[in-house]
Amino acid sequence: MSAPKSGGDPLPHPPKEQLPDISYCITSPPPWPEAVLLGFQHYLVMLGTTVLIPSALVPQMGGRNEEKAKLIQTILFVAGLNTLLQTVFGTRLPAVIGASYTFVPVTISIMLSGRFNDVADPVERFKRIIRATQGALIVASTLQIILGFSGLWRNVVRFLSPLSAAPLVGLVGYGLYELGFPGVAKCIEIGLPGLIILILISQYMPHVIKGGKHVFARFAVIFSVAIVWLYAFFLTLGGAYNGVGTDTQRSCRTDRAGLISAAPWIRVPWPFQWGAPLFDAGEAFAMMMASFVALVESTGAFIAVSRYASATMPPPSVISRGVGWQGVAILISGLFGTGIGSSVSVENAGLLALTKIGSRRVVQISAGFMIFFSILGKFGAVFASIPSPIIAALYCLFFAYVGAGGLSLLQFCNLNSFRTLFILGFSIFLGLSIPQYFNEHTAIKGYGPVHTGARWFNDMVNVPFSSKAFVGGCVAYLLDTTLHKKDGSIRKDRGKHWWDRFWTFKNDPRTEEFYALPFNLNKYFPSV
């Protein structure tokens, strides 16, 4: 198409199946020194969730700093294993597989169940609760393993279009807004400078100092965390938080001596380290529903990762394969006793966008750091002592990038269609509104809107409707596949024709380049 004449109508930006301006795509690794630093950066980012979840749950379970340190080490170790499995045998996307907030409500429900009230020793109570979550996770893992490896989830993904994927991927990022600025505000004198410095280094400095363009853009996390961590250290050293409330000290202080002293120098986590798993049918069903919610959210996260890795849309068979290996990740989490299930790390997906480096090798190196620092507990505990508002400042940028990745899929859709506008607007609105009702009800009354005598049934209903990505994605998927589907023009409005070539593995040569299994395994496990 020729360029418009001067004064003519401007041309729209052409849709791009692969995101341009990515420095290193999924198959092109950066030089080793740079790759190692980038891998360490991914490790720093995933530490946030790894530390925050045990820090919130372990004291309520009855555990001490020793148990908290061991649980953090276990989650780190398992995350490293699962990330390697996903990048080598799963989708092969540069996706970090870490602890997921989706499983937290079910873990809390297990913790509050009356069957542990008779345990007097707090540490023994902690171990019993962990063993109960182990049993639930082991059973729940079968859902994703069966749906993924049998190809059943592939049949669901085939009906996905850019229109229905946009709310799903968008809410995977934007739906985590509660972990962003509210976390920054827990210690505003640390969190807000962290956010401002991160934006200055990553967005403005590359344009001001041309020679260091790539350095500032790619290593903004390391620079900003180091600067603000040092600033927080001097505030702590100067006595700024002496005499303040416990919550403020926990959020602001850098001298978490309890965690560092409690961590062993060298410790290798092992399966069933807390004891034999405890199985309960109700808890297993509740955890299975959380697993299904994580499956839907991870499908959106895989699409976001593929976008920022400058890869094409993953074929349904590849996403299904990744879901199967994510089921294996939940199984490993259950065997090792992490107390929480696994899914795709949304914050690390956002880091791909910030650095413009979607290399698979970088994420595999980060998995090596996870395993290394999980074994050397003291060193890992030092990095785990980074104040949470600094991590929340990173989340503000990373979750925004993932949400924007979802909105970018709308370039394939007809935004002048009222059908498109209805599905897009209605699904995003309900994706925010319904979980808001469920979460508000839980915060005010202490239990969800569905409150029967069966705790497991309550969790099976309350957990999915508390997930913004799950609600918004399901509403968009349902409307998009049922509303005037037989109309021929609707297919183009949905953007389906842009993804047709990626719906089977052999249709596009780029698919095999990005997603083929290593060691010629496609010969024995062919994708369709």
Swiss-Prot record:
Tissue: Weakly expressed in the vasculature of developing leaves.
Classification of source organism: Eukaryota, Viridiplantae, Streptophyta, Embryophyta, Tracheophyta
Family assignment from sequence similarity: Belongs to the nucleobase:cation symporter-2 (NCS2) (TC 2.A.40) family.
Protein name per UniProt: Nucleobase-ascorbate transporter 5
One Pfam family from the record: Xan_ur_permease
Transmembrane region(s): 35-55, 71-91, 93-113, 133-153, 159-179, 181-201, 219-239, 285-305, 367-387, 390-410, 418-438, 460-479
One of the record's GO cellular component terms: plasmodesma
Classification via NCBIfam families: NCS2_1
Gene assigned in the entry: NAT5
Keyword Membrane found: yes
Subcellular location: Membrane
Origin superkingdom: Eukaryota
Disulfide links within the chain: none
Keywords from the named record: Membrane, Transmembrane, Transmembrane helix, Transport
InterPro entries, A to Z: NCS2
GO MF: transmembrane transporter activity
Region (Disordered): 1-20
Topological relation to the membrane, as annotated: Multi-pass membrane protein
